[in-house]
């Protein structure tokens, strides 16, 4: 908002419109000719056409970009058939681009909350609606105090080797407890599985044609084993003054793995870091052009594989490179 958008707003050939929902890409075979949009919540839609030689780029995200492609007649054949029955796909069936890779492999980081307690710790809970006056004064007058940073005060990573494979894991520390473990002296260790995980899902559409992701956590038991190893290694390094509250510090690898995969308020959580649902070489090519199309591109988290760290920066880097490659196509 402060960088890319501000630069774009200064361009004479840029138009910015809010309250707009793109339903589908209009196309003539493999050529995108425009988009159908709804504005300001209207039930009806209208079309916006592009000039000859123009392009359409979807940056709707790892859930809605696959939905947009499916509504445009690009995706798994059975899904397109169902969408067509409901009037969502308007492209004739002979022009459908059947590609099961659209929406496949969607990924989110499985998230685990481990509550740690020490009587040497003073927890700090952030309240942006009613912060302590002394902390407000510190921030407003001196740009100091706890509100100069987020509640997650540290982050760390490790790689777990499994034969020839390597699985990435991330840990962060939050300044207070979570769920029903909120006693002063409690902090939260968040554990995420990241790159190299094998358990992925698919972006499916409900009866209304709306994207509903399936994270499919721990469908491959090796993923639970990798994250359990990460947790076990952390427990071995904890000082004697720091005690896990919702799982025993002396738990075995097998016990940790079972706990991780058992649904609870502290395990199997989504962090909404959705990615990887329109992957390169199967859904888009190296220029992020949708396979089977001449001028339709996808630039967002759906083209990025699972990353070791928070995916935001990785998505930005991939997007900048994608723009360079797309611009080069027109030269």
Predicted segments with their positions:
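Conserved redox-cofactor binding core of oxidoreductases
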Residues: 1-32
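N-linked glycosylation sites
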Residues: 10-13, 82, 98, 142, ...
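Loop/turn elements at helix/coil->beta-strand transitions in domains of secreted/extracellular proteins
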Residues: 12-15, 31, 52-55, 293-296
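Structural recognition of the beta-strand scaffold that forms the well-ordered cores
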Residues: 16, 34, 56-59, 70, ...
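Glycine-rich loop(s) and the adjacent beta-strand/alpha-helix scaffold that form part
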Residues: 25, 36-144
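Short, solvent-exposed loop/turn segments at the edges of secondary structure
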Residues: 30-32, 101, 107-111, 117-118, ...
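FAD-dependent oxidoreductase catalytic-site/capping-region signature
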Residues: 144-331
